């Protein structure tokens, strides 16, 4: 039986994924599925550059801005939802097009994942409260007492991985890294993945990063984060790690001017984009890479869309 096709359009932030994916979906009767870990949250749709209404009016989009930032989400939960959407799309005779830059989600969909048991909500809250009380160093010390392997591999400043490792050990009695030795579960083995990697020339990428942040700041991101601040959500909350959030919070707290906040967010975005490019180059081997160094070359990519499908 011929395998059904899935298009994955990936690459660094501000590389043009959303635009190209939207045009591809219009041309080939596609529906778009989010594969970005931050664009699932409805309260931060502006700062994460989620698809505008002009896009969603033309093409069906899935798994964007449907969760509250106060809700826990994981790669396993994402995979379950994404798999359901992909199968629904193909059942309608349409083409699933996945757009995003979260490497863990992409890697798990394509190559399988290590099935770590779900963490109970009570335990999550317990660990979160403990972290608020003792901070990263205190939690890392507790992790080291229980799981020296995880402690040796996780930086004390990596809040999300630190909390995750501690939760997993308390829930299972095993190191989170012990699950990585188990065979990976394949969830979409009856599909054929076509991976398109957008790789802009670095100077051009940094320019688009800066321009997008400037646009986002001017088009409502300040008010968006101010509203979250009023909800008294902890500023180190893992679901608020989208680039620009902490810089705007610093501005709202009076610790940075608006120009300083924008500049800091732009610098962090460029660093993030660089890490994404490195990851995709190293981790995804079977892919089509599209390179461009200016807006004119980017526009020409539309001419090669027929070769994708």
Swiss-Prot record:
Gene3D superfamilies assigned to the protein according to its UniProt record, in alphabetical order: 1.10.20.140, P-loop containing nucleotide triphosphate hydrolases (3.40.50.300)
Cross-referenced Pfam families: IPPT (PF01715)
Family indicated by similarity: Belongs to the IPP transferase family.
EC number: 2.5.1.75
Subunit composition and interactions: Monomer.
Keyword vocabulary terms for this entry: ATP-binding, Magnesium, Nucleotide-binding, Transferase, tRNA processing
Cited function: Catalyzes the transfer of a dimethylallyl group onto the adenine at position 37 in tRNAs that read codons beginning with uridine, leading to the formation of N6-(dimethylallyl)adenosine (i(6)A).
NCBIfam families membership: miaA
Any GO MF annotation of the entry: tRNA dimethylallyltransferase activity
Stored InterPro entries: Dimethylallyltransferase, IPT, P-loop_NTPase
Residue numbers binding substrate: 13-18
HAMAP family the UniProt entry points to: IPP_trans
Any one biological process term the GO annotation gives: tRNA modification
Catalytic activity: adenosine(37) in tRNA + dimethylallyl diphosphate = N(6)-dimethylallyladenosine(37) in tRNA + diphosphate
Enzyme class, first EC level, given as a word: transferase
Region (Interaction with substrate tRNA): 36-39, 160-164
Protein known as: tRNA dimethylallyltransferase
Required co-factors: Mg(2+)
Species this chain originates from: Rickettsia felis (strain ATCC VR-1525 / URRWXCal2)
Positions with a binding annotation for ATP: 11-18
Residues the record marks as site: Interaction with substrate tRNA: 102, 124
Keyword Nucleotide-binding attached: yes
